[in-house]
């Protein structure tokens, strides 16, 4: 799992240990962001059920102004924090440990 494009391109993202999740593949992520690319730069992003934070981090890497990450799971919340720091986007991120539903 990595950041596909932007300022954090190539940054490896840590998975949530012990969780049987299937992260969004790089190909799917790239296709999604190709569709919305005209709306990302300067945007305020909300990454609900953030998991690893990869979608919000990708948006920040591609020029989003800010991202609020929402994750209830304690282990995943910790991984989002680590991944945000590793991608060097901490100044544009707020991470909330709460239910999104």
Summary of predicted features, one role per range:
Residues 1-101:
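Class I S-adenosyl-L-methionine-dependent methyltransferase catalytic core
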